[in-house]
């Protein structure tokens, strides 16, 4: 009789014809009993490329042990990672968003190719998180995501954004070389993902809210007993999911994605969450659009006073209880759907039932009557500069509107050099284009320019718009994901120096002061300003990637 717990591995190892397969597996440690067990793949993103992932092999070992102890046979395999923090501001950053697709494709390929019945995915650096979940949703086999964990604070509560902003301070002459080197040497003390509510911590929190991580997985330091235990529990959880036939399609829904968006907003999370949640929803067959972020954002406040716009680090949020008490606050306020299923086999409300509130003395997560911002910091803007939408991150500290004069650059490097050379005046709207998914290719993050702006003391005096992305560490008056992008003839590619641009975060508008006849005249003479690769992964990506307004996916319609 067929073992219903082994719908995929049985095809690989059962019967006379699969004798060669069993022979191969014996060489990697299988014994007679292992062939009777469900096989669980452990997808590790370990790499010495980045501190975000340097410890994940050990975490994979703990996940393997947890799965084996629960009665499965676990098999560890690896995939790649690209370090955003290291490649930022260089041509290598073009490969960052591309790596999301490569990681997703490779996990799907390994799990489906080897016939694993379930999977634990473990991610550290930014693109790991959405990539792992996208693969889980494509495969639709019992699976749990484990976050590799956040880094400990550096000296004087420094983190990677401290280093980027120190570059701008050095260029402005407000610090000297010795002070810059001191920041460089003390900001990153060891393993773990970047320490504010940047993209990695944002996405880990979103995935926990989505129901595909165990409770508290998003709020544990990388080097901690809690994180090791999380991995062991994840291995066992996948075995339980196999036994009760609980799959991602039983967990993810429009309601669960609304929960994820709600938590991202309450935490003041990264603009990258918009791009990644759209992509994840596409892989799960869920109808999610940019406008859903606006609808939810009208009712959900920002409650967490965390970096980059706030004061506190993720490690400090962990100390007071992580995001589970916040989620319970949101549930009790009627802002979360409590009846959605999670990977524990229980509903969200059941998972949160016994969660204790934050200590009364803490001021990291605020009460609803004293929010950091009364509505969402993530704004979806439309207008003649962004007919298909753009994404802004508006904390309110930089104001709610900006009107200025365009200064156009056709690459990140051109803009960064102008900022560092002191050539950007107050009242300027810096336009960085041809950095979209197709135009980059790869949709680079603009952390170097935004950090240089902040370091130069121009954070409240200039704005930046781009068809590229922003790091979760970016803050200031910044608008990204402008669509259509310049490379496909979008209006951002028609701008000229001196054009007047208006950004209105209250009206959710992004516009240039030009009538349609002038835009049509410019469009008629527009030509692509840069060459795109003709070979290799960037060429394949540019040919297949969708608009950022649809998640920049490569397997869509």
Residue ranges and their predicted role:
Residues 1-54, 59-80, 85-86, 91-96, ...:
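Catalytic or ion-coupling anion/metal-binding cores of large enzyme and transporter domains
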Residues 96-105:
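Glycine-rich, highly charged phosphate/nucleotide-binding loops
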């Amino acid at each position: 009789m067929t073992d219903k717990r082994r719908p995929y591995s049985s095809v690989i190892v059962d019967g006379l014809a699969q004798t060669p397969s069993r022979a191969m597996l014996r060489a990697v440690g299988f014994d007679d009993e292992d062939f009777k067990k469900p096989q669980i793949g452990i997808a590790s993103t370990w790499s010495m490329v980045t501190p975000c992932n340097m410890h994940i092999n050990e975490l994979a070992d703990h996940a393997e042990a947890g799965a084996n102890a629960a009665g499965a046979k676990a098999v560890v395999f690896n995939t790649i990672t690209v370090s955003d923090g290291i490649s930022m501001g260089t041509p290598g950053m073009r490969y960052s968003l591309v790596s999301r697709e490569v990681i997703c494709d490779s996990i799907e390929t390994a799990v489906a190719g080897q016939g694993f019945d379930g999977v634990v995915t473990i991610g550290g650096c930014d693109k790991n998180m959405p990539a792992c979940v996208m693969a889980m949703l494509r495969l639709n086999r019992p699976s749990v995501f484990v976050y590799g964990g956040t880094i400990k604070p550096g000296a004087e509560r420094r983190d990677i954004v401290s280093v980027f902003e120190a570059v701008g301070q050095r260029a402005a002459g407000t610090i000297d070389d010795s002070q810059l080197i001191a920041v460089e040497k003390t900001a990153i003390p060891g393993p773990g993902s970047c320490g504010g509510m940047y993209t990695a911590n944002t996405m880990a929190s979103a995935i926990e809210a989505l129901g595909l991580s165990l409770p508290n997985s998003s709020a544990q330091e990388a080097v901690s007993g809690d994180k090791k235990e999380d991995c062991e529990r994840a291995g066992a959880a996948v075995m339980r999911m196999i036994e009760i036939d609980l799959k991602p399609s039983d967990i993810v829904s429009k309601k669960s994605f609304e929960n994820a968006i709600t938590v991202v907003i309450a935490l003041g999370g990264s603009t990258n969450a918009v791009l990644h949640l759209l992509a994840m929803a596409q892989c799960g067959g869920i109808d999610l659009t940019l406008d859903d972020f606006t609808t939810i954002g009208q009712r959900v406040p920002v409650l967490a006073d965390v970096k980059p716009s706030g004061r506190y680090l993720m490690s400090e949020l962990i100390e007071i209880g992580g995001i589970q008490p916040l989620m319970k606050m949101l549930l009790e306020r009627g802002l979360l759907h409590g009846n959605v299923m999670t990977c524990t086999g229980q509903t969200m409300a059941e998972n949160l039932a016994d969660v204790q509130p934050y200590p009364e003395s803490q001021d990291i997560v605020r009460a609803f009557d004293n929010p950091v911002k009364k509505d969402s910091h993530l704004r979806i803007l439309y207008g003649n500069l962004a007919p298909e939408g753009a994404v802004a991150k508006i904390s309110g500290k930089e104001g709610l509107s900006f009107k200025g004069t365009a200064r156009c650059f056709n690459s990140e490097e051109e803009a960064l050099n102008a900022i560092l050379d002191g050539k950007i005046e107050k009242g300027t709207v810096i336009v960085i284009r041809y950095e979209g998914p197709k135009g980059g290719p790869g949709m680079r993050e603009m952390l170097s320019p935004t950090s240089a702006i902040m370091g130069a003391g121009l954070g409240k005096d200039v704005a930046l718009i781009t068809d590229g992305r922003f790091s979760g560490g970016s803050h200031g008056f910044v608008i990204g994901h402008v669509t259509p992008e310049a490379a496909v003839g979008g209006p951002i590619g028609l701008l000229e120096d001196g054009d007047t641009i208006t950004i209105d975060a209250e009206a959710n508008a992004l516009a240039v002061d030009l009538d349609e006849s002038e835009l049509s005249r410019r469009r008629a003479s527009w030509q692509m300003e840069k060459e795109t690769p003709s070979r290799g992964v960037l060429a394949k990506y540019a040919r297949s990637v969708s608009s950022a307004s649809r998640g920049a996916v490569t397997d869509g319609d």
